[in-house]
Amino acid sequence: IFDALNDVDNVKSTIRYVKKFGGKADCAICYTIDPHHSPVERIKAALHGRPLHKPVFTNEYFLNKALQLESLGADMITLKDMSGLIPPARTAELVRLFKKSLKVPVDFHTHCTPGYGLASVVSAIINGVDIVDTNIWNFAGGPAAPAVELVYIFCKKLGIELDLDMDAIAKINKELLTIRKELSAFDTAKKFPRPFNPVEDSFPAEIDRFFNDAIEAARKDKEDDLLLY
């Protein structure tokens, strides 16, 4: 349940009726950022007596929206990054803040469009998020969410138990790849991922080590190091 402009008034009745008829109200806050102004733009604005607006989309802004939704009966709160804009460091800040301030579970949703979706998911997991949204291997990455297979590897290394049937996921993944190939004329990607099943396959030691290094970087809030992996 969400409003693209985070207008809480627009979702009040939806939350009420979802709960009235026995549903779970998963209420989302849409993540976005303020415009970026160059130093030249700032100087011009000051010279013309039109100072640029103060930041709107602060951590406090997102927390306030989450608290409002919780007070309306949200059964969980999703930090919904529809455009893949949130970097790992900001993810860590918001997840920690939400977990400290909210009484309901917190979900994290992002995309890989700019290239750091998986790093942000790892950061969310390490900072205590309850749920992360993923995609299957053959449809993950790019404009989609990170691959569940990679998240599974990270969680295993972190000692986090996942209630997932990875064998069933592998079968679904294989079947849907066949369908994707049938629709290849409409696919922007001309290369498909190599087959991979984390239950049966393993990485070379030097690749496996990257997962450990990424976890260590995320734990230390070293965003630049995390993005290297």
Identify what each model region corresponds to.
Residues A4-Y229:
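Catalytic cores and adjacent flexible loops of soluble metabolic enzymes
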